[in-house]
Amino acid sequence: MSDAATTIPSDEIDKLWNKARNQLVEAQVECEESLKILSKVRTEMDSSQKSRFKLKFILNCLVNQVEFFKNIMLEKCISTELIDNEWSKLVLVEIVNDVSYWQNEITTKMKILQGTKYDLTDDHSSLSDFICMDHVDILQQKIDEIPIIKQQVTNIRQHYKSIKDRIENQLVAVKLKKLRTYFDSHFSRDSKNNLFKLLESDYVTELNEFENELADFLRSITDHFDKCTILKEQQIPLPDLKELFQIVKKDDTQLENIRELVFETGLEVKAFSKKVNETISEIMDKIGGFHLLASKIVTELEKCEEYLSIFQKIANLVFVYKESCIKKIEQVQQLCEFYDKFKLGYKNLLRERDRRKATALQMEKILKECQEKLQALSDADLDQRQQFLLENGDYLPENIWPGYIDDMESMYSFEYSIHNVPN
């Protein structure tokens, strides 16, 4: 160790070591600052790149929402199911036809009852006197409401067409198309104006290069400091030590250049950070423009949803009309069935009247025949009594059969009445 000391001045070694240590500390501080800047830049770049996927997601959501509103809500639910099927076919055709049919039925039934003469008493002239004639108007109110319902459906068709045109000509053809074009122009991977390309490619390459350069600078300065430390400790053979000393002295001459490169790289990193931030700021401006266009579409969709309340109100109106018609039709059906049975019952009643009259006549005939037979028998009885008295009266005292022997009163009394059956 003493030989090495005589060969290599220790103060010179100390000078080299101290210089290497100072340069390493300063370089570490500068590189750490630059690396922090680069780390922040990378984070901001990653965050900005994620925003592109968010924008794509928002665009797809809006496209799907518009398509859903146009194809499902408007065309399928409102146009096909509600207007064409529920209203136009079921209500305006089937229900209206049923209402008209049953109105005609009950009117016909009423006329039949009016034309059916009542023959049992003089208090009424026809069977219609026994029913409420107001029933003929049960469905008339619904018939009177048909033009109103038809007009409402016509209005709603026009309203539907207006909304559909608004969706197709303004929302889809203008606003949504403008948003697509804006996205493709500024955020599509194939667009020349896509600033995300810088974040995804060029800037990433630059950032990696800066990180590699700083790592190389630190590696070189650290390696030089490690050599100085070995030289300072003087634990290797003298020939190796001398060789190391020459290497260290040579590297020392490059140390200032490396430090200058570290400093310049730090300036470049700051400039790079500024450039990236400016690009990100420009991207954020573009994103702001996207959100502005998207918000207009959202506002338009909200208006369209409000328009649906009009369909709901008309739907409720038509539903109430339909349900009311169904109930009235059921009521009229029951009345028509009752009127048929009422007329049939009246015909059967006339038959019953005739049957009772025939029965009364038959009873009267039987009773008259009976009366005639009884009278004949009574006459024969009187003749025989008189003959008995002529033959035996003079010989029999009256007290032998008191009250009967000379009694000439008929042995029967016959009274009857038959209930009158009116014509």
UniProtKB/Swiss-Prot annotation:
One GO biological process term: autophagosome assembly
Keywords assigned by UniProt, alphabetized: Autophagy, Cytoplasm, Membrane
GO cellular component terms attached to this protein's record: Atg1/ULK1 kinase complex; phagophore assembly site membrane
A GO molecular function held by the record: molecular adaptor activity
Source organism, top-level taxon: Eukaryota
Membrane topology: Peripheral membrane protein
Compartment(s) where it occurs, according to its Swiss-Prot or TrEMBL record: Cytoplasm; Preautophagosomal structure membrane
Coiled coil: none
A Pfam family assignment: ATG17_like
Family of this protein: Belongs to the ATG17 family.
Protein role: Autophagy-specific protein that functions in response to autophagy-inducing signals as a scaffold to recruit other ATG proteins to organize pre-autophagosomal structure (PAS) formation. Modulates the timing and magnitude of the autophagy response, such as the size of the sequestering vesicles. Plays particularly a role in pexophagy and nucleophagy.
Protein name: Autophagy-related protein 17
